[in-house]
C-alpha cells in the first residue's frame, strides 16, 4: 500500500482524522482551534477534480443520468456546524437542497459512495476550505439596498427585519408598517439573492391593526419603544402571534415610562418572545433588561456593536444612540436618555453570558446601531476574547476549542432559524435544507468569504480582475456572481406568515422568490436554543450596575486589541 505523510495528505485533500486524532485548523488569526471530529472519506478513494485527477468519466464520475446524480458536489470540505459538528465530508446538492453529506464518487468503481457524481454534476473544490451554513441576521433595518451586497460578502444569506428605506421610522425601528409598505418592500427585496422576512409594526393595542399586517405577509411583529412598548401593546401583539404562529421581537422601554422590567415580563404571560439587544445598550429597560436572558420564554439576542467589550465600545455608543433615535444633544433629557443605555458593567457581563450559553443569538442592527457586515466577525472575536480571558470551556482543552466553536456558530445559524420558525429550511448544514453555504479559506474565516452559495448557486465570491486571462490576478474583490441576476433569484425565499398565503393580495405580488410560511414559532422556548440554553437567575445592582448570574459576579476587562481586525482591512 502506498503511503503519504499526514502533512502531504492535508495539502492535497484537507485535514482528516487518523487513529482517532483529528487535524486542527486555526480560525483566522484567533486563538480558536477546530479539530476534525470525523472524516467520511475512505482513504485512497477520495475524489478531486482537475487534470490527472479522479473526477473523470469511468473513474470518479459515473455514466448515470441526472436523476441519479447530484447537481453540485463540494469535495473534501471541512464542515463547521452546530448540529452536524466539525466533520470532513463531501457535500451533495440536488434541486437547491443539501442531498448528501458523506462520500462522493462513482458507485460502479468505488466503495462506500453515498453521493453520485455524473456528467450533470458541477464540482466546487472544498479541499482546504471550511464550509458553514449561511448566517441568519434577525435584526435588519432595511435602510439601503447596498446592505445586501455587504451582508453576502461576509456570509449572511438570510436577512430578517423591517423598514422602508431611510425614513426616520426605519432608521430607528425594524418594522415595515402596514400592508402597503409590506407589499412594496416584498417586491423590492425580490431583486436580491438573499432569503428575506419582514416584521410588521407590533406597537399597537389594536388587534385588527396588527392582524392586517400579518395577513399582508409579515413573518413576525416587532415591538419598539419608539412606537410604544407598553404592557397593552405587548399583550395585544402576543395575542395576535399566538393566533397566527409568528414570532414577536421586542425592544423594551428604556425609560421605564409605562412600567419597569417586571411589568414587561408580566405582560409576556409566559409566552415566547425574541428579546433584541438584551444587554440594553441597544435599548431596553435600564438598567436591568439583561435579566430577560434567564427566562425560559425569552429568546435572548445581542446586537454586534457591544460585542465584544473593548476599550472603544463605550465611547462610540453615545453618538450612535443620539443619531439612531432622533435625539438632540442640546436637550438635556435626550442626552440623559442616551446615557442611561450605556453601562460598562452590563456590556462586560454580556460577553460572559454569551460564553456560558445564556445569550443565544447574535444579530447586527444594521445601520441603526449595528454593522451588517460584522455579525460573523464579531461573534468570533467574542469567542477569542473569552478563550483569552476565561480559558477553555468545559469539554474543551488546550488542544482544541470544538465546544466553544459549536456554541458560537449556533448563535448566528441554527438558533435564529429556530426562533423564527425557519429551521426546517435554513440554519445548519443538514440533508434536506437549502444549500445556503459559505466557503472560507481558514486564514480568512469569518472575515472575507471565498464563495457564497444560495440553493447551491454561487451568488458572491472572491474573484480577480475580470479582464485578466485567469480568475486570480489582483485586485481580488468579493463580487456578485450569476446567482445574483435574472430569474436565478428564485433560489431565494421570502418567509411570510401562514395566514398570508391564503391572501390573494400576496399572491398578486408575483414574486420571483418562492413564499415559505414560518412554522412552530409559538412552541419554541429557551430550551430549544442549540448549545445556548443556560437559564441562570440574573440580577443587576441598581446602584453599581454589576451583574450577577446565580449569585456569581460577572466581570471581564475590555480588550485593547482584537484579531480579525486591522491586518485584514488595510487594503
UniProtKB/Swiss-Prot annotation:
Enzyme active site: 325 (proton donor)
Enzyme class (EC, first level): hydrolase
Oxidoreductase among keywords: no
Reactions this protein catalyses: urea + 2 H2O + H(+) = hydrogencarbonate + 2 NH4(+)
Keywords: Cytoplasm, Hydrolase, Metal-binding, Nickel
Any Pfam family matching the protein: Amidohydro_1
Official protein name in the record: Urease subunit alpha
Organism the protein comes from: Bordetella parapertussis (strain 12822 / ATCC BAA-587 / NCTC 13253)
Amino acid at each position: 500500500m502506498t503511503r503519504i505523510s499526514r502533512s502531504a495528505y492535508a495539502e492535497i485533500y484537507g485535514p482528516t482524522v487518523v487513529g482517532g486524532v483529528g487535524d486542527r485548523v486555526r480560525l483566522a488569526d484567533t486563538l480558536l482551534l477546530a479539530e476534525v471530529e470525523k472524516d467520511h472519506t475512505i482513504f485512497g478513494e477520495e475524489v478531486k477534480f482537475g487534470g490527472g485527477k479522479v473526477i473523470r468519466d469511468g473513474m470518479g464520475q459515473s455514466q448515470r443520468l441526472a436523476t441519479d446524480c447530484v447537481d453540485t458536489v463540494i469535495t473534501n470540505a471541512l464542515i463547521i456546524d452546530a448540529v452536524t459538528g466539525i466533520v470532513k465530508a463531501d457535500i451533495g446538492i440536488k434541486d437547491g437542497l443539501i442531498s448528501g453529506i458523506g462520500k462522493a464518487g462513482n458507485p460502479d468503481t468505488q466503495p462506500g459512495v453515498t453521493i453520485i457524481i455524473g456528467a450533470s454534476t458541477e464540482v466546487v473544490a472544498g479541499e482546504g476550505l471550511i464550509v458553514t451554513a449561511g448566517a441568519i441576521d434577525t435584526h435588519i433595518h432595511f435602510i439601503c439596498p447596498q446592505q445586501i451586497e455587504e451582508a453576502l460578502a461576509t456570509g449572511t444569506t438570510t436577512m430578517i427585519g423591517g423598514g422602508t428605506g431611510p425614513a426616520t421610522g426605519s432608521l430607528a425601528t425594524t418594522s415595515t408598517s402596514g400592508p402597503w409598505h409590506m407589499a412594496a418592500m416584498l417586491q423590492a427585496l425580490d431583486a436580491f439573492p438573499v432569503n428575506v422576512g419582514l416584521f410588521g409594526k407590533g406597537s399597537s393595542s389594536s388587534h385588527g391593526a396588527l392582524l392586517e399586517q400579518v395577513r399582508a405577509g409579515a413573518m413576525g411583529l416587532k415591538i419598539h419603544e419608539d412606537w410604544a412598548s407598553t404592557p397593552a401593546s405587548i399583550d395585544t401583539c402576543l395575542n395576535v402571534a399566538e393566533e397566527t404562529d409568528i414570532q414577536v421581537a421586542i425592544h423594551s422601554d428604556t425609560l421605564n415610562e409605562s412600567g419597569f422590567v417586571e411589568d414587561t415580563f408580566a405582560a409576556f404571560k409566559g409566552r415566547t418572545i425574541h428579546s433584541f439587544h438584551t444587554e440594553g445598550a441597544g435599548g431596553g429597560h435600564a438598567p436591568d433588561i439583561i435579566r430577560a436572558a434567564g427566562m425560559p420564554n425569552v429568546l435572548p439576542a445581542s446586537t454586534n456593536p457591544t460585542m465584544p467589550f473593548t476599550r472603544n465600545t463605550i465611547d462610540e455608543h453615545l453618538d450612535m444612540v443620539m443619531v439612531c433615535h432622533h435625539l438632540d444633544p442640546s436637550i438635556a433629557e435626550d442626552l440623559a436618555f442616551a446615557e442611561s443605555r450605556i453601562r460598562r458593567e452590563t456590556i462586560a457581563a454580556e460577553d460572559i453570558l454569551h460564553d456560558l450559553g445564556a445569550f443565544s443569538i447574535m444579530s447586527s442592527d444594521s445601520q441603526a446601531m449595528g454593522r451588517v457586515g460584522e455579525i460573523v466577525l464579531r461573534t468570533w472575536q467574542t469567542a477569542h476574547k473569552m478563550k483569552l480571558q476565561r480559558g477553555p470551556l468545559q469539554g474543551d482543552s488546550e488542544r482544541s476549542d470544538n465546544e466553544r466553536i459549536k456554541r458560537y456558530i449556533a448563535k448566528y445559524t441554527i438558533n435564529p432559524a429556530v426562533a423564527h420558525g425557519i429551521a426546517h429550511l435554513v440554519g445548519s448544514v443538514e440533508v434536506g435544507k437549502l444549500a445556503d453555504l459559505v466557503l472560507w479559506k481558514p486564514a480568512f474565516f469569518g472575515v472575507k468569504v471565498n464563495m457564497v452559495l444560495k440553493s447551491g448557486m454561487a451568488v458572491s465570491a472572491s474573484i480577480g480582475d475580470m479582464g485578466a486571462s485567469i480568475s486570480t490576478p489582483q485586485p481580488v474583490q468579493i463580487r456578485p456572481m450569476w446567482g445574483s441576476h435574472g430569474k436565478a433569484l428564485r433560489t431565494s425565499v421570502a418567509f411570510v406568515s401562514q395566514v398570508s398565503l391564503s391572501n390573494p393580495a400576496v399572491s398578486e405580488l408575483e414574486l420571483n422568490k418562492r413564499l415559505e410560511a414560518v412554522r412552530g414559532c409559538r412552541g419554541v422556548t429557551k430550551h430549544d436554543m442549540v448549545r445556548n440554553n443556560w437559564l441562570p437567575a440574573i440580577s443587576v445592582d441598581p446602584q453599581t450596575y454589576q451583574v450577577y448570574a446565580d449569585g456569581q459576579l460577572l466581570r471581564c476587562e475590555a480588550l485593547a486589541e482584537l484579531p480579525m481586525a486591522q491586518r485584514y482591512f488595510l487594503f
